Amino acid sequence: MDFKFDNQRNDIIAKLIETRTGQGITQQELADRIGTKKSAISRIENGQQNLSLDMLIKICDALGKKIEFDLADAPSDNMYELRIFDEPLIKLSLENRGLDGLVCDIKWVNQDKMDLMPLDMEITGKGVVKWLESRVIPKNRQFVDEILKTLGLSHNDTKGIIDVCKGLSLNDSYWIVPKDFKGKFADYNLYENPFSDILSLVAYTGQGQSAGVFTTSPELTTNGMLPKAWRSKKNGIYLYKGGTSGAANAGNEPYSEFYACQIAKKMGLNCVRYDLEKWKGILASICKIFTDINTSYIPIGRIVREGGLNACIDYYRDELGENAVEQLKSMLVFDSVIYNEDRHFGNFGVLRDNATGKLTAPAPVFDNGISLFNYAMPEDFNDLEEYAKTRMSAYNIDFDEIFLSIAGKKQVAQLRKLIGFTFKRHKSYNLPEERLAAIEEFIQKRVRHLLAVYKTNK
């Protein structure tokens, strides 16, 4: 059965019945006017007999009406618009085509708004699909299956996920909506509208219940592997991020976030501030969002796709200037101090003005949970310097080598601020004191070591 044709036919018949009854004409009177039987009119109005074009013209003439129609494009479940705010940027079709997978066909590009296009998207069919796939929840995120199960989706169903969440994110102000969608960004964006509490709980705990068909939730477009959830509070939006679990050395990531940001602050870096809190019985690091409806964050790896750290430094210099380069170098020195093993090309990047498309600044330093020897066992703290030799950066480059390659006078001055540094203890949640004291002692040795290395080699 073709429901689209049935619906159109039923709409026409409903209008004829409305007109007939509105004029006080009975089925028999209408039949007499057009020279047919009442039973024929009854069958047409009941949907038991198809309405021919000739019969439609006769009925309309008998009712004193004429037929007018336009050959409009049929609505399609596969037609979409990529928008920034309420501005259409690209009109496209998205279709799952069996073995070919998700296929995009670009129909129109807003050439007047090229400066506002996603910097990390190639404007081709394959480029759009790749961008959409990078936008939805990653397969390695904890509780990904539980999150998607809540909505009746699978992690391979990119189109289905986009249909449910409209591609809304807390990283930027893009969204993907059906063609001719009348809704306004102000009524749907995640910065100004309530979240789905159901999905936040599922994302953080792995437990929950079914949600509605459309959900205003950032969980479907948030990256990272740890359990996490965005929560909207009176004074802003906060990310709650738990730790790993299931092993003797698991669960220390929230502590590392809390302590590492103290080091960054002492050095004078532009950094995200972290606190600790228990939610649903799970310890989390919490931080306030650093994007907003007018400012987006783009991971550097989405823009600079080859060339490593040197290419990133060149990009910062070309797009943002020398001050931005110094900030990047300071972050890398900070990572060398705390032995950040997870500073990859997805957790540092740049901020962008959504209204103009111009880059404005480096993003603040964030995501330092896999640092300060969070995976170390108690016996490793008997000789942290020896244990540190087994740790490596995410770039597979020794931390000392990174430091020597990028440190300058500004970074050395920032290092000196750490002499005599100690952590501020949390009022409720802390690592064991002996572990924390050992890390403090190591930081002092590490700072002196790096200063000596710089003096010897510069």
Descriptions of predicted regions:
Residues 1-18, 22, 59, 66:
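N-terminal flexible/basic segments that precede or flank functional cores
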Residues 16, 27, 38, 53-56:
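Helix-turn-helix DNA-binding elements, focusing on the entry/boundary residues of the two helices
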Residues 24-42:
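Short alpha-helical DNA-recognition segment
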Residues 48-60:
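Short, basic-rich loop-to-helix N-cap that marks the start of a DNA-contacting helix
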Residues 64-74:
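Short C-terminal boundary/hinge segments that cap the last helix of small helical domains
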Residues 73-333, 337-339, 351-458:
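Phosphate/dinucleotide-binding and metal-coordinating scaffold of catalytic cores
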Residues 344, 349-351:
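Conserved protein-kinase catalytic-loop segment immediately C-terminal to the catalytic Asp
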